[in-house]
Curated annotation (Swiss-Prot):
The keyword Glycoprotein does not apply. Keywords: Alpha-amylase inhibitor, Disulfide bond. Inhibits mammalian alpha-amylases specifically but has no action on plant and microbial alpha-amylases. This is Alpha-amylase inhibitor Haim-1. InterPro entries: A-amylase_inhib, A-amylase_inhib_sf. Gene3D superfamilies: Alpha-amylase inhibitor. Pfam families: A_amylase_inhib. Disulfide bonds join C11-C27, C45-C72. The keyword Iron does not apply.
Length: 78
């Protein structure tokens, strides 16, 4: 699950609100990322090229929390 993955590097930023979580790749290389949620919600990994802004679900209205952006395996095992 996403909670056991490695945190994305500092150049990958996220902002979260109740509806959306935006993940921005300000790094110079591509990363495969997802978002970790406090309740363990699992969302698919997505590829982020340099400069990309990805949209993931927000924390909702039921007390969930976005813990951060995390890296995914690049070999398809994520």
């Amino acid at each position: 699950d996403a909670g056991n993955r490695i945190a994305a590097p500092a150049c990958v930023h996220f902002t979260a609100d109740w509806r959306y979580t935006f993940v921005t790749n300000d790094c110079s290389i591509d990363y495969s990322v997802t978002v970790a949620y406090g309740d363990g919600t699992d969302v698919p990994c997505r590829s982020a090229n340099p400069g990309d802004i990805l949209t993931f679900p927000g924390y909702g209205t039921r007390g969930n929390e976005v813990l951060g952006a995390v890296l995914c395996a690049t070999d398809g095992s994520a």
